[in-house]
């Protein structure tokens, strides 16, 4: 367990949720404690600032929580990566597998991103890396963002599930505040 910011007391572990064999990391206590949430957002913003981003991408749904705060603090645009059929305009889509199923992410085609951008992809947790890699590939393939100009940032990393390694192997950068091993 790596937790240099002392946020562990605000993360609950729930066994066998959403299916047997999965240990869910529940961040609601962190969100309900203003000082802990402020610390998390501040530290994630500090990690982001050194990357010099031009946009922040929030992954549905818990990634939205942190991405909005980070984008606001960095004065950068916030782009939403949503589940299928949640966006009103034509969208690019990328299917991927989760540790307990499969789905897709979508970003609107009219989003103002280009090959000149440096983006941060924000989510609450990295498990197998499927969600983050799908989002990063969507940005690279459809908006021309160079892989080395994409940073995947999460509150929590579960390195034993291989997600961070998968992100790095895809040519993307990765960082997190906490790691549960």
Which residues does each predicted region cover?
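PRPP-dependent phosphoribosyltransferase catalytic core
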Residues: 9, 134-181
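Acidic, divalent-metal-coordinating active-site segment for phosphoryl/phosphodiester hydrolysis
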Residues: 123-133
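Short, glycine/charge-rich flexible loops or terminal/linker lids adjacent to PRPP-binding catalytic cores
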Residues: 76-120
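Generic enzyme active-site microenvironment
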Residues: 58, 121-122
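Short Gly/Thr/Asp-enriched flexible loops that form oxyanion-binding sites at enzyme active sites
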Residues: 65-74, 136
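Active-site-facing substrate-recognition patch
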Residues: 1-53, 108-110
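Short glycine-rich phosphate-binding loop at a beta-alpha junction
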Residues: 52-60, 150
